[in-house]
């Protein structure tokens, strides 16, 4: 059985907990404590300025602002600031155009967060940790304005609201030294500036099968890690998250431990440059972020 993500987001409030608990016996029995990670806030400081971003292994979050909306909608428990402090360096930011601004949404659900709030969190973090960079995907969500209007709002943030100096907006991947202290824009909208276009096959190799059933998703994640190790070049992005069959939290209960255990396995020992690894609820599994970060070049 596969559940369409858009239908899920429209109907999330009407799903009964009893019905969910019957699905394949995979639901957690009760509330669980979330383990804080030990990832450092300055992990990029150990990497040389000449390091290509594509040769790093970068923890990220899927739908980074999605903390509200209920079981089928929430993808994160950490705030943006908490994610960055824990070692997350890729943010997946979904923006609805409303009133000349970007409101952060997951489907129809406003996340009590505006784009300016996200930028403030990034600015404050990077000011305190100048060795770091943040890679940010910006995507339109739950609005259907044209590219020109979406761009006009983004330009307003850059210029009238004074955020241009925070961004690195380029046509190709910068080396880490050029990106330190900056937000590197990954444009997932035709109107956004710069040449790092989300999905450009010359720049990216993306695994994001969000409709894969939980048992079918893991082989896709594992095989994309193997491809990244065997064929370096583009920016690999390997979404651990899936929206099929179960709520994001429950899928993360299965996929996050599998990811940690693979990265800690003998097969993965010594591999570097595994790309960006966006996850739901990365705080749920002790040692997960450390396992991702361990696959960066030693210096």
What are these regions (language model features)?
Residues 149-157, 198, 288-294:
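Short, aromatic/basic amphipathic alpha-helical patches
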Residues 95-100, 105-170:
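Metal-dependent phosphodiesterase/phospholipase catalytic core, i.e.
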Residues 55-58, 89-93, 134-138, 183-187, ...:
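Structural recognition of the beta-strand scaffold that forms the well-ordered cores
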Residues 11-14, 32-86, 100-114, 118-128, ...:
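Long, acidic (Asp/Glu-rich), low-complexity accessory segments flanking structured domains
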Residues 22-35:
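C-terminal region of N-terminal signal peptides and the immediate post-cleavage residues
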Residues 165-271:
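Surface-exposed substrate-engagement region within the catalytic domains
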Residues 1-19:
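N-terminal secretory signal peptides and thylakoid transit peptides that target proteins
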Residues 143-145, 192, 244, 284-285:
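Short acidic, S/G/P-rich loop/turn micro-motifs used as interaction or catalytic elements
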């Amino acid at each position: 059985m596969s559940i369409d993500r858009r239908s899920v987001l429209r109907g999330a409030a009407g799903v009964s907990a009893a019905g969910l608990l019957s699905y394949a016996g995979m639901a957690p029995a009760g509330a669980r404590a979330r383990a804080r990670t030990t990832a450092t806030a300055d992990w990029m400081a150990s990497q040389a300025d000449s390091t290509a971003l594509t040769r790093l292994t970068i923890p990220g979050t899927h739908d980074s602002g999605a903390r509200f909306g209920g079981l089928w909608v929430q993808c994160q428990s950490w705030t943006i600031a908490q994610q960055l402090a824990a070692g997350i360096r890729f943010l997946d930011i979904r923006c609805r155009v409303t009133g000349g601004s970007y409101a952060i949404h997951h489907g129809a659900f406003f996340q009590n967060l505006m784009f300016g709030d996200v930028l403030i969190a990034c600015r404050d973090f990077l000011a305190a940790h100048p060795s770091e960079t943040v890679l940010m995907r910006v995507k339109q969500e739950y609005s259907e304005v044209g590219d020109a209007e979406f761009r006009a709002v983004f330009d307003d943030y850059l210029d009238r609201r004074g955020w241009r100096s925070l961004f690195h907006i380029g046509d190709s991947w910068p080396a880490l030294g050029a990106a330190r202290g900056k937000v590197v824009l990954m444009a997932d909208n035709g109107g956004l500036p710069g040449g790092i276009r989300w999905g450009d096959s010359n720049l990216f190799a993306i695994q994001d099968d969000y409709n894969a059933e939980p048992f079918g998703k893991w082989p896709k994640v594992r095989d994309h890690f193997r491809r990244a190790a065997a064929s370096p070049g583009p920016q690999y992005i390997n979404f651990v998250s899936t929206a099929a069959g179960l709520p994001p939290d429950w899928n993360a209960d299965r996929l996050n431990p599998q990811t940690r255990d693979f990265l800690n396995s003998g097969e993965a020992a010594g591999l570097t440059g595994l790309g960006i690894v966006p996850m739901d609820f990365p705080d749920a599994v002790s040692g997960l972020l450390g396992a991702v970060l361990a696959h960066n070049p030693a210096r």
